[in-house]
Amino acid sequence: MKKTIITTLLALVAMAFSSCSSDEPHWADLEAHEKTEQLRRQYGPLIVGTWHYDKDVENQRFFEKLSFKDDGTFTGMRKWQTRQLVTVNGEQHYTGWETLELSGTFTGTWSLSYWAPYGGEKRNYLELTAKYDNEDLNYMAYSTCLTFGYANETTLHIQGYYVHDDDGWANYQRGDAESSF
């Protein structure tokens, strides 16, 4: 009797640790996976191409060009200049323009996803990871998840990272433009 019970228990333990084979993947968050796939189908082809964003205000000038490829890679260039308002002899003047170290060309990867990378509410993200092409710049050009609004034939609407419009969004325009400064 004891032998039968032990044999039965061992058989149950062996069955519990044996895997059932399935060709279907198991997702930790099926909803996020399905919405990510839908997001990529709907907007992935629209994002592929070259986009630019230009912002010129009194104390800073910013230009960025991003070229997204359908293999999930992208290249970019950024030009960023600032100047300070100083008082000389009681009068305010701007200093000359200084190019920030964050300027330069970079290469990396991109992806669209639906998730909550920082906790909280899930939403659509454009994930960007890129290193500067200049090896002397020892930091990333991008390593972030930007909230993704939409893309169409003319506009890529994403949360601004370095620079943005007053509403917090950056509206990149399609096309291969050059910096005006």
Question: Where are each of the predicted segments found?
Answer:
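Sec-dependent N-terminal signal peptides
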Residues: I6-L12
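Positively charged n-region of N-terminal signal peptides that target proteins for export
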Residues: M1-T4, W110
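C-terminal motif of bacterial Sec signal peptides marking the signal peptidase cleavage site
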Residues: A16-S19
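Lipid interaction determinants
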Residues: S21-T109, W115-F181
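Residue-level detector of intrinsically disordered/flexible regions characterized by low predicted structural confidence
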Residues: T4-I5, S67
